[in-house]
């Protein structure tokens, strides 16, 4: 539980040695704490949102560091509370001593995500925006960053608020019939309310369809590179990365384990997984590698099946039943295409010359064009798993409310479903919250955020 009377402090920049570090402090005791560790009258020189040079001192008056203090008085701060950001030299000893001094003067160590949690609790942002802060920090691609920034700007929250307003409108009409039970819902009114609810169902469906794209943006597209031994899987990994990551050899079975690296492709994050060649083998270690290959294939979002197009075609490599899209890469085409492969649809590719790379990139983008979130106005909308859960429940209650009106049931039943739908919308933005939900969200943040 966050105590608003507690003043918290933590390092906002990454731990370790660097040129500059930033210590963030927030809470009602900020000014008193600064007075204790700076020269007399320093705090009188502080001006809102301006950096002021000062020497931070320990309890004996000895200098800890020359620092710049930027003062953000409430409510115009990140957290909505009095906040100070101390920019000091980035040595680990300096930041450690400075934090200890702040704690000695009355500050408490911040919990992970506590600054952003306070911003939410103080109304500086809704819960979707608070989640977006972490998405911005962890974004692994241009599209993921764009979606996170859209959410931080209130893109999802605005759509949820619009749905909420429509639900409140319908509920107000239903409540009126509860208050005046002698009147029945007229056919025209029922038709209008049903049209509104069905429109909401369509909007909810549109939002729910962005969940898979949101997962791909946040986690990256798991792309397994698979095929028989010695067809150039590791060479393909190295080619896409632009450097030698995997060992390449003409000896079959060189790759015994999965090798995973990430790249950005046309704004998308791809998690490339080089796998062991699949074949019948009595080698225990190679069998273990093949087991891992099958596991990677089962969990992949995309499979790049590599074949040596310069040699005769053999039977397809044994693999588990796949649900992921599959692209056939006809590798080593610089050595000539064997007649067996000439009529086979696939991407002609050469790790030696780079031929086919553009075609491969276009094919990958095309494979996910329908899954990735699209623009809604000027926003890129991509809900997360929590949003998906609550929106799904909301949609079910909207559907039940529609059925209740259609069956001309007592308005109390319709109102009950509408209130439940509103509750689930409120869970998304934090208008309705539980401490368990907040704890789960903010515990994934870093200390200084």
UniProtKB/Swiss-Prot annotation:
K(+) binds at residues 230, 249, 251, 254. Pfam families: MMR_HSR1 (PF01926), MnmE_helical (PF12631), TrmE_N (PF10396). Mg(2+) binds at residues 234, 255. One of its GO terms (biological process) is tRNA wobble uridine modification. The keyword Secreted does not apply. PROSITE patterns: G_TRME (PS51709). It is found in: Cytoplasm. Its EC number is 3.6.-.-. Belongs to the TRAFAC class TrmE-Era-EngA-EngB-Septin-like GTPase superfamily. TrmE GTPase family. Homodimer. Heterotetramer of two MnmE and two MnmG subunits. Exhibits a very high intrinsic GTPase hydrolysis rate. Involved in the addition of a carboxymethylaminomethyl (cmnm) group at the wobble position (U34) of certain tRNAs, forming tRNA-cmnm(5)s(2)U34. This is tRNA modification GTPase MnmE. It comes from Akkermansia muciniphila (strain ATCC BAA-835 / DSM 22959 / JCM 33894 / BCRC 81048 / CCUG 64013 / CIP 107961 / Muc). The gene is mnmE.
């Amino acid at each position: 539980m966050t105590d608003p009377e507690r003043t918290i402090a933590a390092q906002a920049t990454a731990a370790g040695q660097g040129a500059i570090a930033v210590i963030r402090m927030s809470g009602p005791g900020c000014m008193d704490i600064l007075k204790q560790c700076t020269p007399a009258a320093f705090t009188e020189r502080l001006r809102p949102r301006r950096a002021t040079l000062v020497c931070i001192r320990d309890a004996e008056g000895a200098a800890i560091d020359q620092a710049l203090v930027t003062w953000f008085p409430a409510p115009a701060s990140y957290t909505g509370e009095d906040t100070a950001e101390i920019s000091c030299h980035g040595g680990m000893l300096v930041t450690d001593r400075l934090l200890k001094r702040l704690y000695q003067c009355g500050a408490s160590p911040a919990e992970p995500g506590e600054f952003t949690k306070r911003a939410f609790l103080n109304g500086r942002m809704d819960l979707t925006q608070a989640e977006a802060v972490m998405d911005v920090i962890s974004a692994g691609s241009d599209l993921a960053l764009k979606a996170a920034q859209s959410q931080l700007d209130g893109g999802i929250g605005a759509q949820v608020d619009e749905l909420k307003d429509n639900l409140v409108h319908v509920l107000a009409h239903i409540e009126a019939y509860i208050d005046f039970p002698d009147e029945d819902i007229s056919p025209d009114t029922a038709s209008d309310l049903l049209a509104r609810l069905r429109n909401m169902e369509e909007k909810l469906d549109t939002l729910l369809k962005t969940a898979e794209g949101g997962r791909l943006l946040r986690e990256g597209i798991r792309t397994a590179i698979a095929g028989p031994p010695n067809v150039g899987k590791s060479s393909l990994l190295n080619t896409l990365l632009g450097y030698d990551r995997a060992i390449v050899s003409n000896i079959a079975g060189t790759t015994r384990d999965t090798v995973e690296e990430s790249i950005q492709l046309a704004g998308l994050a791809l998690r490339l997984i080089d796998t062991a060649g699949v074949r019948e083998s009595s080698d225990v270690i190679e069998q273990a590698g093949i087991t891992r290959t099958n596991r990677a294939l089962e969990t992949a979002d995309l499979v790049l099946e590599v074949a040596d197009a310069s040699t005769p075609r053999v039977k397809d490599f044994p693999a588990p039943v796949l649900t992921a899209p599959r692209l056939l890469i006809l590798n080593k085409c610089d050595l000539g295409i064997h007649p067996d492969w000439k009529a086979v649809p696939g991407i002609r590719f050469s790790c030696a010359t780079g031929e086919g790379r553009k075609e491969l990139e276009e094919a990958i983008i095309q494979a996910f064009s329908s899954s990735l979130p699209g623009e809604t106005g000027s926003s890129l909308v991509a809900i997360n798993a929590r949003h998906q859960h609550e929106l799904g429940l909301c949609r079910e209650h909207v559907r039940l409310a529609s059925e209740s009106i259609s069956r001309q049931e007592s308005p109390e039943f319709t109102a009950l479903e509408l209130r439940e739908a509103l509750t689930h919308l409120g869970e998304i933005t934090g208008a309705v919250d539980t401490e368990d939900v907040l704890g789960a969200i903010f515990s994934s943040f870093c200390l200084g955020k």
